[in-house]
From Swiss-Prot:
Cysteine disulfide links: none
Name this polypeptide is given: Peptide chain release factor 1
SMART domains: PCRF (SM00937)
A Pfam family reported for this protein in Swiss-Prot or TrEMBL: RF-1
Assigned protein family: Belongs to the prokaryotic/mitochondrial release factor family.
GO cellular component terms attached to this protein's record: cytoplasm
Keyword Ribonucleoprotein annotated: no
Function of the molecule: Peptide chain release factor 1 directs the termination of translation in response to the peptide chain termination codons UAG and UAA.
Transmembrane segment boundaries: none
N5-methylglutamine PTM sites in chain numbering: Q231
Subcellular location: Cytoplasm
Region (Disordered): 283-303
Gene Ontology molecular function: translation release factor activity, codon specific
Protein source organism: Helicobacter hepaticus (strain ATCC 51449 / 3B1)
Amino acid sequence: MLIDKLKPIVARYDEISSLLSSESVLSNIKQLTELSKEQSDIESIAQNAKTYFSILENIVQNKALLEDKELGELAKEELKDLESAKATLEEEIKLLLIPKDPNDNKNIYLEIRAGTGGDEAGIFVGDLFKAYCRYADLQKWKVEIISSNENNVGGYKEVIALVKGNGAYSKLKFEGGTHRVQRVPETESQGRIHTSAITVAIMPEVDDVEININPNDLKIDVFRSGGHGGQSVNTTDSAVRITHIPTGISVSMQDEKSQHKNKDKALKILKARLYEAELEAQNAQNKEARKTQVGSGDRSERIRTYNYPQNRLTDHRIGLTLYSLEEIMLGGLLDEFINPLIAHAQSQAMGNIEQ
């Protein structure tokens, strides 16, 4: 029951309040800082819980007055208000009880790759990347292209970007997976609809403290950068490929003229990929995580279809269909499907709290 989850939180909050006024804690900066942070983390839940307990107590008292000739009607009216307040507060508390994702406020690496569909897939990589960039502008985020591999028709075989801004991961973490597009290519004279697919990966930016790589586990190869059609971009071995031997995860980087800069970029993306792989492994072992996530985030999972002839966007994970595809893509109005995904994840998590 909800009340059983709240009692220890309130007890701990009151205990910390008492400790923070003690001489021993006030004279210990480290302990004072730790306790103050812990109290701050649970303050909203504790205060709402105390209000909730008070409402429950008032409900009991008013129910006892229902048979009273003089106060019965008044108690009945007050019960309606109390039950309504109780229901509202329960929903607020359940939201507060959802475990915070430690990555939610981090910057992200956005990686989009063309899959099946040839040139059309590459064109859609560009279209979706532009939509993400427009969305980032609306959120006041910054987008920095780390690496891009353009095709010959104005799209990309692959693009990797660093998206910087508060809440970037929390908003975009459900974008990982396979995105399918259905539309008539400009070169299609018969008007036939082609289906192609691209993959998106969302990886939180990590620092050295969060993921530690043993240099002995890395294989570093250098080679000459290659341009379109295989021509050499420069005559020095500036391109870098770093392979993490234990996992086989590999990152190549050749956008910079400096080998050192390419190596630095490749290492940052490698760390993000290793961290992502670690998160996926943890989620696979954690039953609660499996219940609360919206899809697996796995690149092989088809999460969304963009049907241009019907102006239709469908998210298969939550059964959401919108008939405003062009407006959403061109305007960067991705909250049209991002917000329902977040709401669904919260609903799933709240359901777990009730169990």
